[in-house]
């Protein structure tokens, strides 16, 4: 064997091993939930009737609780939230009167995106600038208590019956509820 041929044979395994070491040292990313974990929506919404059809009103904060097979809270796992009428192309509300729909009937809000104060403590008009409005479906991580949270913003101009909210894990565990929004 010639010298370049031997160098090539020795270099290839070293390259493969170093690539594996680098890839494995990145840690458990993405944070998938182990098999047997479950998700439960703690506070599902009931039907909502809005008093002022021209307002934007935040609904309750929705919490999804993730547990391992033994029933203990599990942190830093992905929870996928999905809300009907809140997808990227679900524009059904005309906000400026020009006859063109330019807003969603329901809007998902990530409460962790408002900084330095939580979204609950700042006016709704600032949520967009903070980047808190997100498209459905949206993935969020659980905190150290096993809870992932979302806020649903409701436009009072449109009736929605029924809307479906779903929280799911990558292992197939799903919890959902239906509710309706009706203007008076």
Residue ranges and their predicted role:
Residues 1-25:
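Sec-dependent bacterial lipoprotein signal peptides
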Residues 23-184:
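The feature marks long extracellular or luminal low-complexity segments
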